């Protein structure tokens, strides 16, 4: 009787072992809908393609699009920020780099360049 008990215990152990090994295939998601690995990027309530576009002030822009920063600079809103450095009659602006993966803010971002007014003397013939 003792060998029969050992055989039964061995069969039970093998069965439990095989069930545990095959558990990975039973945990697969079930459903007929589209299954995405990453969340879809949104700008407000609109979907956009981050390899061609970006979200800037709840507007979808092309990665190539530029904007004015002060009266003397242009910047790429998808990659840079236009930050006021001083206020008053002679406003100064800085263009700073956006930090990827974060909501960029002027006081935390590294400086790319200064937008100072270049005073050029134009000579007319």
UniProtKB/Swiss-Prot annotation:
Superkingdom, natural source: Eukaryota
Q: In which tissues is it expressed?
A: Detected in the cerebellum.
What GO molecular function annotations does the UniProt record carry, in alphabetical order? signaling receptor binding
List the subcellular locations: Secreted
By sequence similarity, the record places it as follows: Belongs to the IGFL family.
Function of the molecule: Potential ligand of the IGFLR1 cell membrane receptor.
Protein name (database record): Insulin growth factor-like family member 3
Q: Which gene encodes it?
A: IGFL3
